[in-house]
Amino acid sequence: MPKKYPAGVVAALIVILAAWLVPMAFAARSSTTQKSLRVAHIVIIVMENKTSSEIIGSPQAPYLNALARRYSLAADYSALLPSGLSNYIALTSGSDQGITDYRTPPTAGYAVAAVNLADRIEASRRTWKLYAESIPAPGYASGDTTLYTPGHVPFLYYSDILDNTHRRSSHIVPFTQLPHDFRAASTTPDYVFISPNKRHDMHDAPVAFGDAWLKRWVPRILASPAFTSTPSLLVITWDEGVGSDQHVATILAGSVVRRHFTSAQPYDPYSLLHTIETLWRLSPLTQNDAQAATMLEFLR
């Protein structure tokens, strides 16, 4: 027969247990709050069309592998669809918005009327810019050139940006502006999206080309005032894999990132979007990002 304890003893145990659990819950909430308060800048670099196995462990990507070992690697991060543009749109709006193939230029009627991350960022009084390498002019959306494609510039696909010439041209700018903007933390946008050109993003060129480009620019970003004087986060990921293999490398770096850390937890573009929203206390854009696991485990 189970042993019965006096009601007073049970009540005392409940009080003790509550006293033990409440501080733990508060500590967990405090940890997330502290992280949200201390991430000032978020930089996202999106490379192209390579599986994780083509990057991690590859002799063609020595810089990326060294960066992953030094900082953090999401070893089970996957694109959502084998369509780069779909993943770009999902990463910035919480849905592929019905775009399941490559559609360019956005001026051909492909833009969608969807609330997006740029809207949330501006509403929170933060700043943002997308730096596109080899873009012919600020806000250019008319079509592909030898090295540039608007299909790698997701914010051009939102009608509230595409149809607003001033907003488009002031936020979607040539990559050559980045060194000037990054000279001071105060002039570095809070949210930065970097789209390398087709030679450097690995889409139409060997992995080694992209690795060399990142080796040139990532150290400059990490050594910039935004990263040395304020807590900032850099994420390097890929838009999609190849065929049925949609596992892509995703590397996190910066002073707020754990060192020598690898996670086997499954993540996707909605996870990265939800992480940004959580860090900056932005409202989720859809149920997709609202329900996605955050990547806060990579932060320290």
Give the ranges of each region predicted by the language model.
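N-terminal Sec-pathway targeting helices
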Residues: M1-A12
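Flexible, surface-exposed loop/gating regions in the mature catalytic domains
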Residues: R29-R300
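Bacterial N-terminal signal peptides
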Residues: A11-W20
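C-terminal region of N-terminal signal peptides and the immediate post-cleavage residues
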Residues: W20-T32
